[in-house]
Amino acid sequence: MADTLGRTHPTIQAKADNAATGPVRLVLFDIDGTLVSTGGAGMKSFGEAFEAAFGVAVATEKIKFAGRTDYSLFREMCRHGGIDCTAENRELFFSHYLRLVDNHLDASKGGPFPGVVRMLDELAAMPDAPALGLLTGNIREGARRKLGAYGLWDRFALGGFSEDSEDRNLIAAAAAAKGGEHLECQLDGPEIVVVGDTPNDIACGKHIGARTVGVATGGATLEALRACEPDWAVADLTHLSATDICGG
């Protein structure tokens, strides 16, 4: 497959039938490992916030964060730490988390991955530009702070977040529904593209019938993403253009 300059990239795998057969109305992006690297700000903040809130240390290195939702991660940490997973405890935990994630973002050397800003610019400049949204396991305010740290939050009109569900498939469904409300139409699955860096991102995109892009900048290797059979699998977003995924 060739890029917009005609160069062939062996890092790209595309399905034979993934050419856009109809308009793409909504493109949904995961955040961590897909849009940005935060230098581990989220993981560090989770461990520190749990100890600050409950006086219990939980080894976050034993917990798999990639492709997860914040609410499900909090539930797992409660299980490890012997803390009741109540709404009150969750609210207390995330109040500490947001304070700490700000500190870690300020100290981190993170930023957007290669090709991200160009892709967002290209999508926004298309004649019939799709709406841009988020499909993330972050709580909404955590997402705002992570993307805001790198000037990207205002690029997105809507999103599905951890508040919508602990189940990523249901977050995807919520994001699609919000996209339909934003566009004032009923969206069909193929009118949506989901971009993410883990098998869970690809799976939730398929759950709503969307076209899927696996990008190997975060939680999974290119080979692992290819095994999930997304519509596109790329090393990073420099190897894909807006017209590749949206047509035109």
Language-model regions, residue ranges each:
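Asp-based, Mg2+/Mn2+-dependent phosphohydrolase catalytic module
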Residues: 1-25, 85-88, 117, 121-124, ...
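Active-site neighborhood of HAD-like aspartate-dependent phosphohydrolases
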Residues: 4-66, 72, 78-80
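Short, acidic loop-to-helix structural element flanking the phosphoryl-transfer center
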Residues: 15-16, 23, 28, 102-134, ...
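Conserved Rossmann-like nucleotide-cofactor binding loop
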Residues: 34, 41, 140, 200, ...
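Phosphate/oxyanion-binding active-site loops and adjacent basic polyanion-contact surfaces
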Residues: 38, 42, 112, 165-171
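An amphipathic alpha-helix signature
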Residues: 43-47, 71, 75, 94, ...
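A metal-dependent, Asp-based hydrolase signature
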Residues: 66-126
